Amino acid sequence: MQQIQISDAAQGHFRKLLDQQEEGTNIRIFVVNPGTPNAECGVSYCPPNAVEATDTEMKYATFSAFVDEVSLPFLEDAEIDYVTEELGTQLTLKAPNAKMRKVADDAPLIERVDYVIQTQINPQLASHGGRITLVEITDEGYAILQFGGGCNGCSMVDVTLKDGVEKQLVELFAGELKGAKDITEHQRGEHSYY
């Protein structure tokens, strides 16, 4: 795995914090609940006695970052920055693979489609309290989807399916996927977005 990208500004910030700690203290980058929708990334101090034999050490100019073996694959393509905004400065940690491991390009179609749904489509639907689940891919090449949360019973679900989800999936999986179909039994209720 390649090194986690830590900007110069973030490295400077960590160095300042580490200067106030016991000598030999470095940082630990980790993921809590990796591979789940509730995954959260974090950074903590890592004193010398907290380094495990199974940790991966990533060396930077003035310190090292340690990552435990469970978190490691979920931190692939992660970036840490220290951003200055109007309201002050803030440490940002982007880890696109924290919620789900990246799937290989030659993985079965169902795994690749599910990965796109979980990492690209569901985050868009989450603003409406909605989500979709991939049920199966038919022999004819259709992704069978189940809508849940705010999408269930929403009057806009057909538009979301045809113009949003299906279009995105067919473009990404051209030649492999013909379309998407909804098998949800929509029950309109207070949970429905529209």
UniProtKB/Swiss-Prot annotation:
Keywords: 4Fe-4S, Iron, Iron-sulfur, Metal-binding
UniProt KW ATP-binding keyword: no
Organism phylogeny: Bacteria, Pseudomonadati, Pseudomonadota, Gammaproteobacteria, Pasteurellales
Family as reported in the entry's similarity comment: Belongs to the NfuA family.
Positions of [4Fe-4S] cluster binding: C151, C154
Cofactor binding notes: Binds 1 [4Fe-4S] cluster per subunit. The cluster is presumably bound at the interface of two monomers.
Function summary: Involved in iron-sulfur cluster biogenesis. Binds a 4Fe-4S cluster, can transfer this cluster to apoproteins, and thereby intervenes in the maturation of Fe/S proteins. Could also act as a scaffold/chaperone for damaged Fe/S proteins.
InterPro entries linked to this entry: Fe/S_biogenesis_protein_NfuA, FeS_biogenesis, FSCA_dom_sf, HesB-like_dom_sf, NIF_FeS_clus_asmbl_NifU_C
Subunit description: Homodimer.
Protein name (database record): Fe/S biogenesis protein NfuA
Encoding gene (name): nfuA
Required cofactor names: [4Fe-4S] cluster
Keyword set includes RNA-binding: no
Biological process terms in GO annotation: iron-sulfur cluster assembly; protein maturation
Annotated source species: Mannheimia succiniciproducens (strain KCTC 0769BP / MBEL55E)
